[in-house]
Amino acid sequence: MLVLGSLCPAQSSVRGAETNSVQFTEPAPYTTQEEIGRRFGFAIVPPDYDLSRERFRLEVPSAQQTNLVRGLLVWLSPGDDGYFPPLWQEVLARHNLILLAPLQVGDQRHAIDRLRVALDGTCNVCRNYRVDRRRIFVGGYAGGARIASMVGIGCGDIFTGTLCICGVNFHLNVPVGGTQYYPGSFYPNPEIVQSARTKGRFVLVTGDGDPEADKMKAVADLGFRRDRFNNVTLLLVPGIAQATPEASTLEQALALLEASASTNAAPHSKYPQRQN
């Protein structure tokens, strides 16, 4: 599917949301060295990592309603500040989505650390809030989007939707003509990939001026679709290199990601529930 989006420089503020910088101490069951290897195919020894030293930006809509069931968007930035466009924050509030943005995990950080931080944060939010398992999304911009695409495929049994803006990775080589191709950058277990193929929803956002546009179009058509992923949408936003996509583009993307929420079964009960 191909959909046109648009740009807008306006900004807005969030009403009724609570924003905190938080830390967690208990790792997720799916961030062990064995699980990272199974999900992403990395054979190297991962760097030293201490979850208790990591920080996250956490924004909870209608925080005063403690028993409200919410969705979750884990947002990955190319920089260390966990930047999330202010004009999008009201969209998340309308969709009743918690925002979790890891800090200090920009493009200079080791890829395995970025994956582990995102997954540990996801698990801990699910331990502390009532999260709708049918609406657990991961997204990002540029280098953050490349990591998000890896999470969406390698953790298709956890995340139900993936939003990639101006960046994407894929697990297979993607041909671009002749002997040229975009190389696959990770190697997940085939059973994990099958879960992402059949249940995951992927929205790729690009447009004129995006240096990654050709790759994103190729990955959408000759990667995801050729590899039989069921739900992949390419959104084209004119002038995307000059401004942030407007709120209506995020609305489009979330509508596509949420389309299956009423029919998808919740993930297996091994995933953590809220601790009362």
Predicted regions and their residues:
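Bacterial N-terminal signal peptides
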Residues: 1-6
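A domain-start/cap signature at the N-terminus of enzymes
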Residues: 10-71, 184, 220-222, 232, ...
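Alpha/beta-hydrolase fold active-site loops
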Residues: 68-71, 97, 160, 200-201
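Active-site machinery of serine-nucleophile hydrolases
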Residues: 70-127
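Alpha/beta-hydrolase
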Residues: 74-76, 165, 237
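The feature captures the conserved acid-bearing segment of alpha/beta-hydrolase catalytic domains
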Residues: 170-252, 258
